[in-house]
Structure formats: structure tokens, C-alpha cells
Amino acid sequence: MTRLLHIQCSPRLRRSASLEIAHSFIQSYRQQRPDTEVTTLDLWSLDLPELDQTAMDAKYAQLAGQPLGNAEQRAWARLQALAEPLHQADLLVLSIPLWNFSIPYKLKHFIDLVSHQGILFSFDPENSLQGLLRNKTAVAAYARGLDFSSRSSTPAPAFDFQKPYIEAWLNFIGIANQHSLIVEKTILGPDIDQASRQAAAEQAQALAQQLAARQY
């Protein structure tokens, strides 16, 4: 059985291109693997705590190897609980719209809450940083309204801080096996939008069949 975690990052729901492509992937994957267990984290309905002084005190106490007070223990336990679905998953699917050339603030908030030493990575002077989510696969469905090709006014090397950031974060926490699904030009008219979504959905279905053939 594959445990699939879908992190949903768009509030647009039925109108979301990233969510549409992620659903195409998940549906096709489940057709190949009917026993797949799917868990969804909708970041817009999830109660994300603030990374406040107590949580930061807990973080630095952990780094220093110092005991945590009661309030710090509660704050740290909440961060661990938020990260637990990532540890449990075999396959991580993220549906990510591009906002102002980067990722939605809800996703950045989530990443900041769970990306800590002892939760998603380890650190020691001899081995440096080691991601704790090894032997997992990630599929990211990226949606962009504009054209990010090299000939456009927003070429990806200069304007795309969405995909490179997610790839770096996934590598940092130990997920080297990554796949990208990209749908662009979604605000350039209904015909272009529909064609872009259709092409990305076909790529998603093909990738799902490819990954479903593997054993987890």
C-alpha cells in the first residue's frame, strides 16, 4: 500500500489549475494502485500556529541540547505533529500556485513550522545536515498565470522563485526523487488556459502510471 500525502496550497479550489493537475495525477495513480491511502492537508483550512517566541525558544533549546519548559514542550510537540504526515507518507504531492513569482504565504508558513532540526533534518558537526525524509518521492504541480519561457517577458531564470525554492527545500529535507508538473499561461485567455491544463493533465497521468509501476 502506498501512503500518499497531498499538500493543497491554493484557496481557489475548483478553479485552481495546480489542484486540477494534482487531482489528475492522484486519480490516475489510484486507478493503478487502488489500495493507495490518500491524506490531504489543505493549508487554507488547517489551523497553523504562529512561530512565536515560545516556539523559537523551544527550537534553540533543542539546538543547544537544553531541557524544554512545559510551554516549550507543548509548542514543540505541535510542530512535530504538523510534520508527522510528511514522515508517514511514501509519496508527497504538492499543488502550488505561483504568487508574486514565489509560493503562497500559507505554504511558506507551513515550511517554516516544520523545517527544524530533529523534525525534518538532523545536524551534527561530523555529518553536517541530513534530511530525515529519505526514500520518499515528491510530485509538485506548479501553476503559473504567465508564460515563463525563455522568449517571454518573464523568463524562468529571472522570475521563477517557485519551483527552485520547492526543489531546494525538498532536497534539504531528504527527498531527492522529485518530479514536476507545470501548467502555465492560465490567464492568457480561456483557449490557452484550457490547452495548457489539458497538456499538463496528460503529463500528470503519464507520470502517475510511471510511478505506480514502482514498489514502495
Curated annotation (Swiss-Prot):
Keyword NAD: yes
Pfam family, one: Flavodoxin_2
Top-level lineage group: Bacteria
Catalysed reaction equations from the record: 2 a quinone + NADH + H(+) = 2 a 1,4-benzosemiquinone + NAD(+); N,N-dimethyl-1,4-phenylenediamine + anthranilate + 2 NAD(+) = 2-(4-dimethylaminophenyl)diazenylbenzoate + 2 NADH + 2 H(+)
Entry's EC annotation: 1.6.5.-, 1.7.1.17
Co-factor binding details: Binds 1 FMN per subunit.
InterPro entries: Flavodoxin_fold, Flavoprotein-like_sf, FMN-dep_NADH:Q_OxRdtase_AzoR1, NADH:quinone_OxRdtase_FMN_depd
Record keyword Cell division present: no
GO molecular function: electron transfer activity; FMN binding; oxidoreductase activity, acting on NAD(P)H as acceptor; oxidoreductase activity, acting on NAD(P)H, quinone or similar compound as acceptor
Annotated FMN binding sites: S10, S16, A17, S18
Keyword annotations: Flavoprotein, FMN, NAD, Oxidoreductase
Cofactor annotation: FMN
Enzyme class, spelled out: oxidoreductase
Family: Belongs to the azoreductase type 1 family.
Subunit (UniProt): Homodimer.
Function field: Quinone reductase that provides resistance to thiol-specific stress caused by electrophilic quinones. Also exhibits azoreductase activity. Catalyzes the reductive cleavage of the azo bond in aromatic azo compounds to the corresponding amines.
HAMAP family: Azoreductase_type1 (MF_01216)
Name of this protein: FMN-dependent NADH:quinone oxidoreductase 3
Organism in which the protein naturally occurs: Pseudomonas fluorescens (strain ATCC BAA-477 / NRRL B-23932 / Pf-5)
Gene: azoR3
